[in-house]
């Protein structure tokens, strides 16, 4: 059943996911299942704004852990922030996602959004209270992981209202 649910989830078809949840004897168990890397269906859905309907369908199954971590410590918020899935980031923040969570490399969602130059997501995370001075495993702050070759000026205004330590 685990493989079936992940196959339906990764297909991107909301109707398939809803059907799985409606026909399952225990929909919450389907939502809480993990794959070999420890990722939940919510974490797989968090990778694309196109899957917002799937995220909402999964949450309708019952109490869903928006802060669940895979074996590397990644949360759904980190995945969505890295992927540029701004509507998923917004949904996760509205449903209690921890903006301060870091993975096994001490990388936060803000680090990921900054490194990919996802300006709107950086703003969302900062407004939600993300720590601009959080150090990752390489002692880098989010502002300093901005992808080289991209104009830093896009992100500087988002960071300017914060208490960034230089």
Region locations from a protein language model:
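Intrinsically disordered, low-complexity regulatory segments in ankyrin-centric signaling systems
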Residues: 1-24, 32-47, 56, 164-165
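Ankyrin-repeat-protein effector appendages
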Residues: 4, 128, 147-166
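Ankyrin-repeat intra-repeat helix-capping/turn positions
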Residues: 12, 49-50, 84, 117, ...
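Ankyrin repeat domain, specifically the short helix-to-loop turn at the C-terminus of the second helix
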Residues: 21-29, 56-64, 90-97, 123-130, ...
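Ankyrin repeat boundary/linker residues
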Residues: 34-35, 70, 103, 136
